[in-house]
């Protein structure tokens, strides 16, 4: 495994990005939309600024979804019809992968053969489509898992559902088929090797980024006024999907032991926690802290900045987190973070410098750590938080992505020296079909 900036190869001109189960245009914090959506969209936008054209394929979820959305110059989102628009759970999507693949191939057929230089699939469902497209188009496949079933199942929250065996099988297939694997952290690379026997030489470490132009420090009093919060209160915020995996209940239970803390929860339901918002409201009532808990719906990026600025601390108590974009966004706004010491969070948060990491999910430990940080005065960590977040720009992420792409293209050409001949034969067949002649 290596940092992606090592040994830069020829960068691509056009990239096909696959995001089957969730659209990059969806509001993070709702449904299955979260950090991956932000990653897919922001990396595409920043690649386009480098002159790389990006087409993102995702599944249409409403009849109103247009077939094509031009997000920005050089960035296109294609909504592929595959299965019913409403009521299809993420765990039912494997039944629609053939339909999705057909839609992707039909879209590619409107271009000249060889139009895409590379395929980048996100999440295992997309990887299943990716290696079929790779074989059809004779281009390399780069895959980012974002999460792994074995890792999630090893750290299940109470009341959460385990990932099905089908996913683990599918992930193994994608790991075996992908030309390169992109991971968020060194830990994730080690997990791919130990759990899926991945070849370390095919793994690139690429840290996700944060929009440093949007997420910036600002007036805390103004942010609180906009949210209707008392400027004198101590506020600890939770941002994300309301599901057992993200563990917002841990924060509420810890807050019950801290009578001077107000909890601000910004997010919507997803995954196996579809009833979680109501359950979270009920939990606050049961704990006797309803008057100290403020619930907000999922926020736009601009509104999310106010949430981060308004908070004295942001809590990320997840049971599993491949990186933790929320933690970096909060720090970019100058707000320290208390986070679970899991997954990529020890990379996203500098323990004792920009916040604190908590081992495990014991409520007493969380209450003690939050109280300790608040007693020390979070202001002492704010400058360090901003400086740390500045190392995670999308510009850096795209530098590393393009380096990984270049290496994938170079390696693929070395392994498949006749790839151009394959494309030539496909071109001949396609033009013959258009002219009604059998090639």
UniProtKB/Swiss-Prot annotation:
Annotated S-S bridges: none
InterPro entries per the UniProt record, alphabetical: Glyco_trans_1 (IPR001296), Glyco_trans_4-like_N (IPR028098), Mycothiol_biosynthesis_MshA (IPR017814)
Binding-site positions, UDP-N-acetyl-alpha-D-glucosamine: 27-28, 35, 241, 246, 299, 321, 329
Alphabetized Pfam families for the sequence: Glyco_trans_4_4, Glycos_transf_1
Keyword Isomerase: no
Keywords carried by this UniProt record: Glycosyltransferase, Magnesium, Metal-binding, Transferase
Binding site for Mg(2+): 308-309, 311, 335
Annotated residues for binding of 1D-myo-inositol 3-phosphate: 21, 32-37, 90, 123, 147, 167
UniProt family annotation: Belongs to the glycosyltransferase group 1 family. MshA subfamily.
Protein name per Swiss-Prot or TrEMBL: D-inositol 3-phosphate glycosyltransferase
Phylogenetic classification of the source organism: Bacteria, Bacillati, Actinomycetota, Actinomycetes, Mycobacteriales
Gene transcribed to yield this protein: mshA
């Amino acid at each position: 495994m290596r940092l992606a900036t090592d040994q830069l190869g020829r960068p691509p001109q056009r990239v096909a990005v696959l995001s089957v189960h969730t659209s990059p245009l969806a509001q993070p914090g709702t449904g299955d939309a979260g950090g991956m959506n932000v990653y897919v969209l922001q990396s595409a936008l920043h690649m386009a600024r480098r002159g790389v054209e990006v087409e993102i394929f995702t599944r249409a979820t409403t009849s109103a979804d247009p077939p094509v959305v031009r997000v920005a110059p050089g960035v296109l989102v294609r909504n592929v019809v595959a299965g019913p628009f409403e009521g299809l759970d993420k765990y039912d999507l494997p039944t629609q992968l053939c339909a999705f693949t057909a839609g992707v191939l039909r879209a590619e057929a409107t271009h000249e053969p060889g139009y895409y230089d590379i395929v980048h699939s996100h999440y295992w469902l997309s990887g299943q489509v990716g290696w079929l497209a790779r074989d059809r188009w004779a281009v390399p496949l780069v895959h980012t898992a974002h999460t792994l079933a074995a890792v999630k199942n090893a750290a299940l929250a109470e009341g959460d559902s385990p990932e099905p065996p089908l996913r683990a099988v599918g992930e193994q297939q994608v790991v075996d088929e992908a030309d390169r694997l992109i991971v968020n952290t060194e830990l994730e690379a080690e997990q791919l090797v130990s759990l899926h026997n991945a070849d370390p030489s095919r793994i690139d470490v690429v840290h996700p980024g944060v929009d440093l132009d949007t997420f910036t420090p600002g007036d805390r009093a103004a942010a609180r006024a906009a949210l209707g919060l008392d400027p004198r209160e101590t506020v600890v915020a939770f941002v994300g999907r309301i599901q057992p995996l993200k563990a917002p209940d841990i924060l509420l239970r810890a807050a019950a032991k801290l009578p001077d803390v107000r909890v601000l929860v910004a997010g919507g339901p997803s995954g196996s926690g579809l009833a979680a918002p109501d359950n979270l409201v009920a939990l606050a009532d049961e704990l006797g802290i309803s008057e100290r808990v403020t619930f907000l719906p999922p926020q736009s990026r601009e509104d999310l900045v106010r949430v981060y600025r308004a908070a004295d601390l942001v809590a990320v108590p997840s049971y599993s987190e491949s990186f933790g974009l929320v933690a970096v966004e909060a720090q970019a706004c100058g707000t320290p973070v208390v986070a679970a010491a899991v997954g990529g969070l020890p990379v996203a948060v500098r323990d004792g410098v920009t916040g604190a990491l908590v081992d495990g999910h014991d409520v007493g430990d969380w209450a003690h750590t939050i109280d300790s940080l608040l007693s020390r005065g979070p202001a002492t960590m704010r400058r360090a938080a901003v400086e740390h977040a500045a190392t995670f720009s999308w510009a850096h992420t795209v530098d590393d992505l393009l380096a990984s792409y270049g290496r994938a293209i170079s390696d693929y050409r070395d392994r498949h020296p006749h790839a151009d001949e394959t494309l030539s034969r496909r071109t001949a067949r396609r033009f013959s079909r258009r002219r009604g002649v059998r090639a």
